Curated annotation (Swiss-Prot):
This is CCA-adding enzyme. The keyword Magnesium applies. Belongs to the tRNA nucleotidyltransferase/poly(A) polymerase family. Bacterial CCA-adding enzyme type 3 subfamily. GO terms for biological process: RNA repair; tRNA 3'-terminal CCA addition. NCBIfam families: PRK13299.1 (NF009814). CTP binds at residues 27, 30, 111, 154, 157, 160, 163. It holds the Pfam family PolyA_pol. Its cofactor is Mg(2+).
Amino acid sequence: MNDVFLKALPVLQKLTTAGFEAYFVGGSVRDYLLNRTISDVDIATSAFPEEVKEIFQTSYDTGIAHGTVTVRENNEFYEVTTFRTEGTYEDFRRPSEVTFIRSLEEDLKRRDFTMNAIAMDEHFALQDPFSGQLAIQNKEIKAVGKASERFHEDALRMMRAVRFLSQLDFELDKETEKALESQIELLQHTSVERITVEWLKMMKGKAAKRAIELLLKVKMETYLPGLKDEKSALSEFASWDWEKRTTEESIWLGLVVAVKPNNVNAFLKAWKLPNKTIQLVNKAYQYALNMKETWLTEELYHAGKAVFSLVNELNVIRGQENNQHKVSQAYEALPIHSKKDLAITGADLLKWSGESAGPWVKETLDKVECGVLSNEINNEKIQIKRWLGYHEE
């Protein structure tokens, strides 16, 4: 049995000893059945939140309104959630009310897909009322109950369906795909932040190409930031070898290279990306657009290591030769890597000239920077002083 389950077993045992039902549920059970890596577990119980808190010495109300209490056991923290049913979904994401219940099957009934609606008890016996194991055997993503109802409850489940297809290399069953296509406009009610998380998970999957093909088939791109009417660009994007990807930034660089938005900055901001990512991708864009392989000294210097590494990564994804080692060597051989590396400063110029500060200081430093980069002069203080025409003291 997986160590993650064994470590969390005392939580289940404490709950069952107190007379309640308790199970491992959701993604951890699914991944166990698929022999995938399990990082953490979700625990569901018939004990109500106040009852859970009485059983464990240390607990925190992390999601008490939805029945979730975080408990500490053997210096580890576990989320324990009470079985529940949910009322109507008024915003296509959150239920209007949550009711705590004692029935496992009723709790599993509200979950998204049958493969995620399997529970495992403390003896590692499975409870599978919706035939999730069969779906896993058939490599099928099938909604619990009516797919249209599940998607209406939380529109993000449509994006999750496509993401699971990519991660697991599964297929959607016919009813689930039909509901996905007919209700795709509901995705507009989902926050961009949640969509971005699912997009990245999808792109990191082993079947990203098939996932994008399905995404286009159901017209999901219409509701993704900046991708409306970009079917041909996304088809090109999907054709690249994304299994060679090593960074998240390459996904975004690839997307802007394929789409070629008028305003790269605005396009990336629409996905609510961190400023650091936006700046890096924006800087790399023009170089990547030309699939740059050979770099001039000045280009290498102004681009910097992060940019040329990212451009090279996308080149590899697009089928070009990996030039990282060669370009890195050329970069390391540069006499300076930024203006800060110059052997002189503005203070030196003021001292040597006896003049007041002004625009000329920056202009002179720019001139020295170019001279050093072109190997016209060595980056040594005395040589630079002579080169600028200042006499020795």
